[in-house]
Amino acid sequence: MAKCKRNRNRAKRNFTVKTPTANRNYKDTVFRMLFSDRKNLLSLYNAVNQSDYKNPEELEIVTLENAIYMGMKNDLAFIMDTNLYLYEHQSTYNPNMPLRDLFYICSEYQKLVDKKSLYSSTLQKIPAPNFIEFYNGSTAIADCTELRLSSAFEHLSGEPKLELIVTVLNVNEGHNAELMQHCSMLKEYAQLDEFTIFLYTCICRVILINLLLETCFRLAGKRI
C-alpha cells in the first residue's frame, strides 16, 4: 500500500455554524450495502491490514447504515482484535473528517463504557480507534494520505495535546492496485463506479445533442 502523506493545511477562520446533514449520495449507499456483508467486510479488513482472518463471525459490528450522530451518517464501524475500526466512504474531498470522527468516537466510547467505572481507581480499558476513509471523488489525491485533527487548531504552539489521524485511501479506478488485488469486491466497486460515471456522461451528451438539434430545427422553421 502506498506510503501516506500528511496534510497539515491550517483551516481558515470561520465562525459560521451549520448543522451537518447525512450524506445520501448513491456511491455511499452502494458502499454500505456491499460492505455491510460480514464476508465482504472481512475481505476489506484483511486487504487494508495485510492480515488473513478467515471467520467473519470474529467481526463485532458496532454500527451500520442507520448510525447518525450530529447529522453524520457513518458507513461501517466494528471491533476486531479489541480495536475499534471506523470505515467511511467519501465521494467528495472533506478535510473535516478528523473532527467528524472525533464526535463519533466520543459517542461510541460513551456507549461502550460504564460511566460509574470512570470514578474508580481501576483503569478503564477502551478499544484503540482506527479511522479509514475510502475516497472516490473527482478531486485528484494520492493513493494514501492523512488528515489530522491538529490541522484545524488555531494558533497551535508546539505539539498538539489532542490528535486524531484519518487515513484516506483513494479507491478510484487505477489507484491502490495492491489493495484492489486483495479485495475483489472493492475492485469491482471501483469498476462499477467508473462505468456509472461513463454512462452518466454519455447520457448527458445525448441529452445535450438532442436539445441542440431541437433548437436548430426551431430556428430553421422560423426562418422558412
Predicted feature locations:
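Elongated, amphipathic alpha-helical interaction scaffolds
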Residues: 2-224
